Amino acid sequence: MVFTIKEIAQLIGGHVVGDASINIHKLCKIQEAIPGSITFLANPSYEKYLYTTQASAVIINNSFQPERSVSPSLILVEDPYASFTKLLAHYYQAVLNKHKVGVEEPAHLGKHVKLGNLVYRGAFSYIGDYVTLEDKVQIYPHTYIGDHVSIGENTIIYSGVKIYAGCQIGKNCIIHAGAVVGSNGFGFAPQPTGSYEKIPQVGGVILEDNIEIGANTTIDRATLGNTLIKQGTKIDNLVQIAHNVEVGKDTVIAALTGIAGSTKIGNNCMLGGQVGVAGHTEMGDRTVVAGQAGVTKSYKKGNVTLMGMPAIERKKYLKNYAIFKQLQNILQIKKDEQ
């Protein structure tokens, strides 16, 4: 699609300095831009590229004063990063994520299924019995939707996703390729003989509205009750969420994190990559866990940053790490004193 600089400025609420009639057909990084493209400058360390970029337009802070003349037209805004994000979202919807409608055969549709308006079902998708798909749901090819699943309006289920029976998916959710929702929790009872007997997992999974689940992430069903992911939460690729976990609103969880069973995570928390969380622990609201940390106990008060293994509060961790880096010198001093 092609937009003029003027049209883009109107979309993001900016003011144009330069030629507003130029057509824009591509979004680029500032250092890789070409004629006919638009980019943005938010980080001062990239200012040098402003004077050499081939972009036709640059979104920039309205208080910015260039050191010398620039060739591209400028779109002045209050927050360049937020404005470019808005532009990306518009481009994504208009160009990359056009809503599909209808059925691609072959596709299986079970008994007593409730279909909303403008639903898309891709080839080789399987929809079980008593499923509800609300308006504008998109089910991409090679997807499995088990019996008694409900999926809210405008939700997108990408190829290869498996949603087991009885799970509830809210509105405006995105579940990326290969994710599994509702598989059995890891529950096994040790026996006197040394073997393990499987504990039936008869609960469900509830994903509230506006949730995004990354590729190949797994969310286990509860033993009893529900594994619950609350609205607005974003989960990266390759994350494991065990049975009966509760994740609060607007929390973000990075890739390769594993959260053990019956853990409760509050609202607005941030978990970095490769974090491990022990079962039956609790984190309060606005807890931040640094990458590769291992949380072994509860931090119910929230508003804390945790680092290390086992995870401790950031200030204490940094003090301990400073000492750790000096251990060799300290040992040498002790040897010299003997």
Curated annotation (Swiss-Prot):
Protein name: UDP-3-O-acylglucosamine N-acyltransferase
Pfam families registered for this protein in UniProt: Hexapep, Hexapep_2, LpxD
InterPro entries the record matches: Hexapep, LpxD, Trimer_LpxA-like_sf, UDP_GlcNAc_AcTrfase_non-rep
Cited Gene3D superfamilies: Hexapeptide repeat proteins, MurE/MurF, N-terminal domain
Subunit comment: Homotrimer.
Broadest EC class assigned to this enzyme: transferase
Gene from which the chain derives: lpxD
Summary of the function given for this chain in its UniProt record: Catalyzes the N-acylation of UDP-3-O-acylglucosamine using 3-hydroxyacyl-ACP as the acyl donor. Is involved in the biosynthesis of lipid A, a phosphorylated glycolipid that anchors the lipopolysaccharide to the outer membrane of the cell.
Disulfide pattern: none
Catalytic activity: a UDP-3-O-[(3R)-3-hydroxyacyl]-alpha-D-glucosamine + a (3R)-hydroxyacyl-[ACP] = a UDP-2-N,3-O-bis[(3R)-3-hydroxyacyl]-alpha-D-glucosamine + holo-[ACP] + H(+)
Biological pathway: Bacterial outer membrane biogenesis; LPS lipid A biosynthesis
Species annotation: Amoebophilus asiaticus (strain 5a2)
GO molecular function: N-acyltransferase activity
A cellular component term, taken from the record's GO annotations: membrane
